[in-house]
Amino acid sequence: MVPPEEIASASNPDIEGENILHFLCREGDITDLMAFKNVISDANRHLVLQFNRHGKQCVHIVSNPGIADPQEKLKLLMEWGADINGQERVFGNTPLHIAAYTQNHKLATWLCNQPGINMGISNYLFKTPYYVACERHDIKIMNILRAKGGQCRIYRCNEAWLFTRNY
């Protein structure tokens, strides 16, 4: 069980604007995050949705490369009320955008299989996850999104190969 003093200080962000869940999502493994499972309640559920100083919620932190157990962490965060379609404050990227930007095929596949996932959200640069995959010439993520019914229309793109290649 997590000590009460840790929960009491969990709402107090550190100098980076991060609460304890932000830290555990970035630095810990799934067992560290699971230690909070019995402690998360309606009184402190807001911690899951808090933005850090960089405009990221827990779902954005675990979607970045190099994070241990991203799918398991996302599953737990969603149980606690995290928004799988939540947009970060700086660029408006969702976890699916981040998976496309970082070419994380495993995470993109997992996200596309989640109920309620919105594959057609545009970030603040008016790019859908599919468009991001096109920019990166990532046929695999494009196919993952297309197979799950993602928005596949490209309205503007400087890459001529997108219009001449058969998929």
UniProtKB/Swiss-Prot annotation:
Belongs to the polydnaviridae I-Kappa-B-like protein family. This is I-Kappa-B like protein I1. It comes from Microplitis demolitor bracovirus (isolate Webb). It comes from the Viruses. PROSITE patterns: ANK_REP_REGION. The gene is I1. Keywords: ANK repeat, Host-virus interaction, Inhibition of host NF-kappa-B by virus, Repeat. The keyword Amino-acid biosynthesis does not apply. InterPro entries: Ankyrin_rpt, Ankyrin_rpt-contain_sf, NF-kappa-B_inhibitor. One of its GO terms (molecular function) is NF-kappaB binding. ANK repeats lie at residues 54-86, 91-121, 125-154. The lineage of its organism: Viruses, Viruses incertae sedis, Polydnaviriformidae, Bracoviriform, Microplitis demolitor bracovirus. GO terms for biological process: cellular response to tumor necrosis factor; symbiont-mediated suppression of host NF-kappaB cascade. Suppresses the host immune response through NF-kappa-B inactivation. Possesses ankyrin repeat domains required for NF-kappa-B binding but lacks the regulatory regions required for dissociation from NF-kappa-B and degradation. Therefore, prevents host NF-kappa-B release and subsequent activation.
